Amino acid sequence: RLDYLVDPGTWQPLHSLYNPEENEEGTTNVVDGLGKIAGRWAVIIGFDNKVLAGAWIPGQPENILRVTNLAKRLNIPLVWLVNCSGVKLPEQEQFYAGRRSSGTPFFRHAELEQAGIPVLAGIYGTNPAGGGYQGITPTILIAHKDANIAVGGAGIVSGMSPRGGFDADGLEQLIAVTRDLKDR
């Protein structure tokens, strides 16, 4: 997707070795850098779908803040490529809480908007939960015809179904497991 978006020969990757939490994945699960789009420089960031389908993992919010800070300092647009499976649930406590955590990028988007710096999102694929929120906070949204976003309800649960779509049997099974755990 970067090859289609960025003018040839202008991509300059950033933070490719940045892994402050020393994740077993060896990454913060985002790809970011500077590049020209139609002749204009932009800061570009996207979820790395080769790792956990682009899920939020520890260290990712800090990397995102580095990128949003760069867009603010350079006064150039921030462009997102959004295809995110949500969060790596077993480690969510490591990146949800705190002043520089996963909620901060959304605040930063608002700051950029206030400063007149465009925040754009190219949305593709299935984006439940955290991926969905990431896709709705930018100023301008451009979605692929097959893209979807789910920030709550059945869309989240059906997004977890390997069969795709709304899965009534899967929902009933999840409800039964939840009740069983609650009764223990």
What are these model-derived regions, one by one?
Residues 1-42, 48-53:
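Intrinsically disordered, low-complexity segments enriched in small/flexible residues
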Residues 55-63:
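Short alpha-helix boundary/capping segments
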Residues 82-184:
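Conserved catalytic cores of soluble enzyme domains
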Residues 2-6, 61, 68, 109:
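A generic alpha-helix structural signal
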Residues 52-56, 89-90:
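A generic structural signal for short coil/turn motifs at secondary-structure boundaries
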Residues 25-27, 37, 73, 114, ...:
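A generic fold-level signal
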Residues 31-48, 62-91:
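A structural preference for short, pocket-lining loop segments at secondary-structure junctions
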